[in-house]
Amino acid sequence: MNTAITTDLIAASAYPISSTGKFDSTKPADAHPPLLQVTQLARHYPLPRTHLFQPPQQVQALQGVDLTVAAGQSLGIVGESGSGKSTLARLVMALDTPTSGTVHLLGRNLHQLRPTELRHARRDFQMVFQDPYGSLDPHHPVQRIVTEPLQAQGATSRAEQREQAAQVLAQVGLRSTDLDKYPHEFSGGQRQRIAIARALITRPRLIVADEPVSALDVSVQAQVLNLMQDLQQQFGITYLLISHDLAVVNHLCDEVVVLYQGRIVERGTPQELFHHAQHPYTRALLNAVPRICRPAPLPQVSVWRTQTC
């Protein structure tokens, strides 16, 4: 997206706007302890030197991010490419180590857990990746793909794993006979259902979905989003949804966070952000959404008929 907003203008409001008009990035969604709490999260990546005596430089992918998500709620993270969305997802999933800050899930600091503790904790949080073609191993049947999280936990027999896999496939709209098939035998939407089934099989409390429908046809996107909503209502799942598509966020999320250059610049409900955006970058995102204009009305033409005797 091409925006002509200066860095100084963006930095003028580096924290989300509350209903009172004040900036507040730490207000929880309700009075109960949040399921997920991110505090002053930062991630800096060093840049390679171009010559011997160049001082070390770094990219600040995330800078002081604070957010909370209540159990059973959906939080959308939106922003242009390079805004830090996927970096945030990797840190929440403990796939990367933060430069500073903390990620607490169910009261546990994920980045202070021992490897064995983290492996067991992963039962409570899973991820759905963007590409349903690249995230599924083409050499493995569906049963092995879906039961990978169970195998990582080191529990249950193969018969129990197959039974659980058949059950979770039915919950995402597939059949138990699909367990022995391979990814190439499915459409893109069906592959993403398999990816959702893999994330769902451990009954997680949190699912991080990184652009879960962006690689799908528009006609299939709504089906997958409706499935995610149904699963949330059935199992009380909490979603952290990473997306650049504002329509997707509006469809699924209770609250939205806008990221720009690694900082939160605005936060609110979809209704608040899409209809009463306060920050210029949020307005720029909204203005970049393609709109279908009504065709201009055709001019009225009078038709004269020649009468013949």
List each model region and its residues.
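Conserved ABC ATPase signature
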Residues: 182-186, 190
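A short, proline-enriched helix->beta-strand linker immediately N-terminal to the Walker B motif
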Residues: 201-205
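Helix-to-loop junction immediately C-terminal to a conserved catalytic motif
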Residues: 93
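Short catalytic/signature loops enriched in Gly
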Residues: 3-15, 21-23, 28-34, 47-58, ...
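Conserved ABC ATPase "signature" region
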Residues: 109, 160-177, 286-287
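Conserved ABC transporter NBD signature motif
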Residues: 101-109, 121
